[in-house]
Amino acid sequence: MNKLYIGNLNESVTPADLEKVFAEHKISYSGQFLVKSGYAFVDCPDEHWAMKAIETFSGKVELQGKRLEIEHSVPKKQRSRKIQIRNIPPQLRWEVLDSLLAQYGTVENCEQVNTESETAVVNVTYSNREQTRQAIMKLNGHQLENHALKVSYIPDEQITQGPENGRRGGFGSRGQPRQGSPVAAGAPAKQQPVDIPLRLLVPTQYVGAIIGKEGATIRNITKQTQSKIDVHRKENAGAAEKAISVHSTPEGCSSACKMILEIMHKEAKDTKTADEVPLKILAHNNFVGRLIGKEGRNLKKVEQDTETKITISSLQDLTLYNPERTITVKGAIENCCRAEQEIMKKVREAYENDVAAMSLQSHLIPGLNLAAVGLFPASSSAVPPPPSSVTGAAPYSSFMQAPEQEMVQVFIPAQAVGAIIGKKGQHIKQLSRFASASIKIAPPETPDSKVRMVVITGPPEAQFKAQGRIYGKLKEENFFGPKEEVKLETHIRVPASAAGRVIGKGGKTVNELQNLTAAEVVVPRDQTPDENDQVIVKIIGHFYASQMAQRKIRDILAQVKQQHQKGQSNLAQARRK
């Protein structure tokens, strides 16, 4: 994506004119300007320079009385499903952007592009060409919090790539293993190692001291701690604080953290700029609830054990640019470093649990994109492939080639109904479109009911998206406290004849389910089956726990169904004999 289209040029513009304006704004380019009648093309050395040229010139710089319009040059055959949206307000919430994008079709992927501009940029992939065309037509120039969005195509490489060289490692266009590929055949899938970096927030005035003269100090830190350290100096220009990412083992991260903290304390003392320099750790919002613990118990224990004072930034600070919470630790250097070890231990545990749930979801729901759903850090590099086998799980292809419709009942606080519905029903409509599911809120059972039932009908991926957004909305709207994890009760219906299989002999299966998923799973005894001869299974837990339990129960039901069909087939064959 390094080739640029330069539009809105006067007929008299020459290559020399363009060379001059690029030089004046210090924008690098490679090769020659190819000037046509009213437009031109040029190559940039890399994607960074291409984005910088677009941000610098497009609609801002005049040449011979006309404002330049610059965007990625995309051949017609590659104008398919991918677009880039620029000039997004930096404080915009993901929820708002996702709702806007979902109005024009199914978003398969949405990822943020790192730029030096104050506004945000995202690359979006829709499910088909027509949806993309509608999005460009409606969103280009759309006003969002006093920012006019700029939308253009970016190359969709899959359109021109063949099946052999266009995709990675035996996977189809949406992530499914192709028939005959090693993963599809059940070969061992190699798990990537967990790499969740330690992210620190440091005052900008200390960044120079951390890097050192010609990078000597930071090289010394990386060498001693066997780590890779990225100082994000160019992001959020003018900000009072900068992020530093440390990639290493937990021990290496902690050693690097201590060295960086010591440098900041020394610099503060030498320059007399601060009496105290707290340790600030960045953690994705998805993990913070489990770090805090029920009623804040986990966090209180860390404070007591390490003799530190720990505070966490508000949920209200989360924006499109910033899905992370800031954990501020105050105390002596040694104590702060001990607190870092405990905090990151909790964060890594939460991450590993989510990766396990994510692996199961990607195994059972091919094509599921958790970053696009907005439930898993898009920055996480360690996204494992689907597991080659999951205990008790039948291969997806064997029983769900056409995903079956599932009906799930989720119980939410009664006072949250308005937030889920939204003004004039807008939010629930957008949620339904986004998830491709039917979402209805049942009337209250009694006038003073404290909970309301949300009925979601759709295939597994739709269930995942819809339920995830409901959990997220309840947290965002503060229906659960800042130190409280969102745990909801969910009901799924199973055939009465299969309830015993869910429970297992002596409750063995249901106990294993609870241990595996961390959700509470209850099959109420003495239930009267409904008109469809089904009974209720109750699941209580946070989002990933609930999802994992739901999928495992569906596995059990699928196996029961398979065995029943096999038995019927054998019986029919015996009769024919």
Swiss-Prot record:
Keyword Lipoprotein: no
Source species, domain of life: Eukaryota
Protein name: Insulin-like growth factor 2 mRNA-binding protein 1
Originating species: Mus musculus (Mouse)
This protein's GO CC annotations: CRD-mediated mRNA stability complex; cytoplasmic stress granule; cytosol; dendritic spine; filopodium; growth cone; lamellipodium; neuronal cell body
Modifications the protein undergoes after translation, according to the UniProt entry: Phosphorylated at Ser-181 by mTORC2 cotranslationally, promoting binding to the 3'-UTR of IGF2 mRNA.
Keywords: Cell projection, Cytoplasm, mRNA transport, Nucleus, Phosphoprotein, Repeat, RNA-binding, Synapse, Translation regulation, Transport
The UniProt record lists the keyword Repeat: yes
Residues that span the membrane, as ranges: none
